[in-house]
Amino acid sequence: MKFSPAYLLAFAPIVAAHFRLQYPTSRGFNADTMANFPCGDLAQSSNRTQVSLSSGSFPVALRMGHDETAVEVLLALGNDPGTNFNITLHPTFRIEGLGEFCLPNVVFDESVLGTKITDGMNATLQVQSNGDPSGGLYACADIQFSTTAQDEKPSSCTNNTGISAIAFTGAAAERNANESTADGQAQSGSSGSSSDSGSHSGHSSATQTSSTTASSTAGAVALETAAWGILGAAVVGGLAVL
């Protein structure tokens, strides 16, 4: 059986990518280096996404290439933070399904960041997932908080038909995604530390932060999507739990 080039190209993005960070604008994508911490070995971008200070939150849009994925959203403050992704914006949870997925309101207020946010402050967002079959996959976006930026939802913040999110609880939520399976269990051979070379030092503080953030800001950092109906879950205190 022969398939047309157009047919094959339609499936190429999902086949080629473990996941893609669509928004904020990512540093790029390289499937060969995506397993390297931090940021899939991609250099810092000079084109920082402007994030409205007054909004108190911003969307994180992804394109998923695996039907079950553990995902975590981290942040590092500063112009060039290196491996210091010690702020948990969203603890580890599971995404089920392929294609577009969006968290429309990822909170970044002072209680989450642990410091006062000022106009012009730079930061780097890192979305990390469980690896295939082990370790982690990493994608980063460089951002700048701004008092003049508009609070607008990007067109990429959408959810594909059939995609859903499931909140982890307890140890599964506290475990870094690069140490987790898609089911929220510890990866084989991982005893609380990352199985990725060089990533443990960068995530030791993130693990501690995740533990406190998951409990103290679960209501504020809600597991929500642009279309609430796709969760198929009971919403308790703003956090969807199955």
Curated annotation (Swiss-Prot):
Domain of life where this protein originates: Eukaryota
Keywords of this protein's UniProt record, alphabetized?
Cell membrane, Glycoprotein, GPI-anchor, Lipoprotein, Membrane, Signal, Transferase
Signal peptide (UniProt feature, chain positions): 1-17
Ribonucleoprotein found in the keyword field = no
- Localization in the cell: Cell membrane
Q: Which residues are glycosylated?
A: 47, 86, 122, 159, 178
Protein name per the record: Uncharacterized protein AFUA_6G02800
Species of provenance: Aspergillus fumigatus (strain ATCC MYA-4609 / CBS 101355 / FGSC A1100 / Af293)
